[in-house]
Amino acid sequence: MQTTKALLISPALIRSCTRGLIRPVSASLLSRPEAPSKQPSCSSSPLQVARREFQTSVISRDIDTAAKFIGAGAATVGVAGSGAGIGTVFGSLIIGYARNPSLKQQLFSYAILGFALSEAMGLFCLMVAFLILFAM
């Protein structure tokens, strides 16, 4: 007889205990604490409602800062690629001019175009690094 009584849980108790589990995180964080109601408390029941909140500690902030610096460092690696691209473009200009000096003007215009595209990619990588550092 005792086990039958333990298995019967009132529907009001189930509703009050599972209400916190069903709500999304934003509703749990933004809602005001509710006034105590006449519904039974779920502290004595086996169902425990987990309270979800954002907690920031010194350690988690340090991890976030380290992640920012690592991401910014990884983004600035592209600037080295830009430098290598510019060197390749002007090296090819010198080789092309040595092979056929009559194409000087056309080779130079292509070299300037290659320089601009390579420099733009380097500046884009630098911009992403600054965004990671200061905008996030």
Curated annotation (Swiss-Prot):
Transit pept. (range): 1-61
Post-translational modification comment from the UniProt entry: Trimethylated by ATPSCKMT at Lys-104. Methylation is required for proper incorporation of the C subunit into the ATP synthase complex and mitochondrial respiration.
Keyword Hydrolase belongs to the record: no
Localisation per UniProt entry: Mitochondrion membrane
Gene3D superfamilies from the UniProt entry: F1F0 ATP synthase subunit C
MF-aspect GO terms: lipid binding; proton channel activity
GO BP: proton motive force-driven ATP synthesis; proton transmembrane transport
Main location: mitochondrion
Entry keyword annotation includes Metal-binding: no
Alphabetical UniProt keywords: CF(0), Hydrogen ion transport, Ion transport, Lipid-binding, Membrane, Methylation, Mitochondrion, Transit peptide, Transmembrane, Transmembrane helix, Transport
Subunit record text: Homooctamer; the c-ring consists of eight c subunits forming a circle, and each subunit adopts a hairpin shape. Component of the ATP synthase complex composed at least of ATP5F1A/subunit alpha, ATP5F1B/subunit beta, ATP5MC1/subunit c (homooctomer), MT-ATP6/subunit a, MT-ATP8/subunit 8, ATP5ME/subunit e, ATP5MF/subunit f, ATP5MG/subunit g, ATP5MK/subunit k, ATP5MJ/subunit j, ATP5F1C/subunit gamma, ATP5F1D/subunit delta, ATP5F1E/subunit epsilon, ATP5PF/subunit F6, ATP5PB/subunit b, ATP5PD/subunit d, ATP5PO/subunit OSCP.
Job description of the protein: Subunit c, of the mitochondrial membrane ATP synthase complex (F(1)F(0) ATP synthase or Complex V) that produces ATP from ADP in the presence of a proton gradient across the membrane which is generated by electron transport complexes of the respiratory chain. ATP synthase complex consist of a soluble F(1) head domain - the catalytic core - and a membrane F(1) domain - the membrane proton channel. These two domains are linked by a central stalk rotating inside the F(1) region and a stationary peripheral stalk.
Protein name: ATP synthase F(0) complex subunit C1, mitochondrial
Species, as recorded: Mus musculus (Mouse)
Biological classification of the source: Eukaryota, Metazoa, Chordata, Craniata, Vertebrata
Gene expressing this chain: Atp5mc1
